[in-house]
């Protein structure tokens, strides 16, 4: 049995998967478009990096120690706890910031994305972080290789 309540949410009382039904193709489209505006995945980041797309930077929001152990190639380390106007002043405002952390169970990328957005940057969070990057079979780098002084100096 399907019913409609006062807030136009459809309720299917016959199962958990279909308990709450989408409210039509327009709202479904808007929902998924909204998600894709703020999230990306490792395979898209890798493909764009490999293809030489240069309209984004990859930001590692973890600690310098975690970054030194391994990170996405070419990533810039700015720990989320240290993100502010001064520590992000070298980042270009005309590029998208793609932020990641360790993966599921780590919310440094969410916190970093929020901070960067509050500072006026266009931001996407890389789903699954470094964990899903590696599960997809992509290589990582070790050590603080960026020429950015923040990589070595943030503690």
Which sequence ranges carry the predicted segments?
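A generic hydrophobic-segment detector
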Residues: 121-155
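Catalytic cysteine-centered active loop of the rhodanese-like fold, especially the PTP/DSP P-loop
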Residues: 88-134
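Alpha-helical scaffolding within the catalytic cores
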Residues: 82-87
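Short loop/helix-cap segments at secondary-structure boundaries that form the rim of catalytic
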Residues: 67-73
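Short active-site oxyanion
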Residues: 52-58, 73-74, 96, 122
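Short, hinge-like loop/turn segments at secondary-structure boundaries
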Residues: 76, 93-94, 140-144
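Flexible, polar/low-complexity N-terminal or interdomain linker segments that lie immediately upstream
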Residues: 1-58, 62-66, 144-155
